[in-house]
């Protein structure tokens, strides 16, 4: 099996294989080009995003700069996905992001890992595991999602959290390692930051 065929199998492989590196260089040049498109050219930005990423739903926006190992080629975006500055996609294998999900500044989604054994690691070997993030999630600033993690729908991940295990739907989760803090519920329909009251009209206004 060729090394590039192991990108999506979870097997240990050699990422510096010439075929992989050649394609990766082309894709990373596209990221560099995207990062230099002026904000006053939104149509060009959207067009290039669709060229780079595996899938892009309607009304997606990624602030610049962003970074992607494979240029976003293995990233699947639903509709209305927003990413703030400094998004890092270690997209050596697939990353799936659901409709309406938002990322704060400097979020990292890392699908790649390396063997713990120092001999194997010194050879530059790695493996990749996919990341799945559900619909209507909010990942706060500086969140890191590790290889193989699945995050359910309607989840809030607190800023600075490191997500090493799956997170179920409908919860607030925080910490290092990230753990479920509580359920998202009726209280959140009435109150926001430090129990400030929400105007009920907001649900109909926007």
Segments (PLM) and residue ranges:
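Flexible, glycine/small-residue-enriched loop-and-beta-strand segment within the central core
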Residues: 43, 65-151, 176-177, 182-193
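C-terminal/domain-terminus segments
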Residues: 154-163
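Terminal amphipathic alpha-helical/low-complexity segments used for targeting or macromolecular assembly
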Residues: 1-59, 178-206
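Conserved catalytic segment of ABC-fold P-loop ATPases
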Residues: 152-155, 168-170
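Short-chain dehydrogenase/reductase
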Residues: 138, 156, 172-174
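Short arginine-rich
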Residues: 33-35, 166-170
């Amino acid at each position: 099996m060729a090394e590039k065929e192991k990108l999506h199998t979870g097997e240990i492989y050699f990422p510096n294989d010439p075929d992989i590196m050649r394609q990766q260089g082309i894709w990373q040049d596209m990221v560099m080009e995207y990062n230099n498109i002026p904000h006053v050219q939104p149509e060009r930005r959207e067009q290039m995003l669709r060229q780079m990423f595996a899938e892009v739903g309607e009304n997606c926006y990624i602030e610049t700069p962003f970074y992607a190992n494979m240029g976003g080629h293995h990233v699947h975006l639903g509709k209305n996905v927003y990413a703030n500055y400094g998004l890092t996609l270690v997209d050596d294998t697939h990353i799936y992001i659901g409709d309406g999900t938002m990322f704060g500044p400097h979020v990292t989604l890392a699908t790649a890992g390396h063997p713990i054994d120092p001999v194997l690691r010194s050879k530059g070997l790695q493996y990749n595991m996919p990341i799945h993030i559900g619909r209507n999630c909010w990942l706060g600033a500086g969140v890191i999602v590790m290889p193989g993690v699945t995050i359910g729908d309607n989840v809030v991940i607190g800023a600075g959290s490191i997500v090493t295990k799956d997170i179920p739907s409908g919860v607030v989760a925080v910490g290092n390692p990230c753990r479920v803090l509580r359920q998202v519920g009726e209280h959140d329909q009435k109150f926001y930051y430090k129990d400030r009251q929400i105007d009920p009209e907001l649900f109909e206004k926007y």
